[in-house]
Amino acid sequence: MWRGRLPHWRADDVTYYVTFRHRRPLDDFERRSLLRGLLKPDGRQWELLILAVLPERTELMFKVHEAPSTGRPYELSDIVEKAKNRVGKAIIKKSEERWPPFYEESYDRIVRDEAEFEERWQAIFDAPVSEELAEAAEDYDCLWVADAPDAA
């Protein structure tokens, strides 16, 4: 019987694409909180390449770093889930909802080649415009791109 924990393929020195859905549309404050929560492990546990927190889903691409204590890569599910849990608890406290606004499961995929990388990166970058959240992707405050002038 399926109980909600799908297996996730792992490999070293690869780029991952991850997306997860939200139980309900997130408001501006919640989207910014999730963005900050996912940026927190950047540079230590992973190298975040692009991140878009949209009202109904979140999409990101990154490379996982090795844990200094073990020499093995961090578990990507742990990184993403810890950020979701931390932000989810804060949202529950503020909204008095019973459950965090994100589903537990996420979809992840190893990016196989440069063409797939470019396709997925561009789709994430274009998502705020295609969903009519901003006139230009650069204007959407919950889109983060590595090495962009405003990336912090």
At which residue positions do the language-model features occur?
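Short catalytic/metal-binding and nucleic-acid-binding patches
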Residues: 1-152
